[in-house]
Amino acid sequence: MAKRRGWRGSLLMGLMAVAALGFVGTAQAGKAELKGNFQVLSDEKSTHKPGKVQLTEFADFYCPHCHRFDGEGLAILEKEFGNKLEAVMVGYPVIPGKLPTAFDMYEQAKTMGKGAEMKRAVFRTIHKDKIGIIDKAIREVLIREVGLDPAAFEEGLASAKPAKAFEDGRKWGDRIKIQQTPTVLLDGNIKVEQIDPENLKLIIHSILDGDGTRK
């Protein structure tokens, strides 16, 4: 099982490191200096767009730390950066013995324009309501909750498309060597395992500050 830790614990570790060392790490991306604790993946292409930062969260619906980060940590970042931050989740299973139903539901909802809503509903159902989502009746409740038609949703779910999208995301995570969830990828090639909001804010601010020198 991949190791995981909550962002609150990471925050304490991050602040201690910053106090001792000034900045945990710096790197050059183009001409812009990035600050914080991160790894630039040289084999991956940057997807950066001026004035925007793309945040990809590799997460397991059954991971409690992923649930906490998605509900608390991500909210802090969205409040800090507003429409300058584009966040999306990629399903990456690390908890053994779980069927891929939750991930397939998320992928199908994305194709119908309700990915973020379904993500929140699935996380809540698993971690707060403590209800499994294998049963079709439970799925129908969630599908209606996010404003989708159950018949159309189930038809799409039965096709190969959601499963393929989930598998493509898993392969992406394997390629960039995800070791724990949640792990964040910024702008396609900046990998962040220390996912406390303070470290992520430091990195994202430095990306945005460097836009004037980016080619």
State where each predicted segment sits.
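Sec/Tat-exported extracytoplasmic proteins
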Residues: Y62, G73, E78-F81, A109-G113, ...
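Extracytoplasmic/secreted envelope proteins and their assembly/folding machinery
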Residues: G71-E78, G82, A102-Y106, K119, ...
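Solvent-exposed, acidic/flexible segments
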Residues: G51-K52, C66-D70, I95-A102, T111-G115, ...
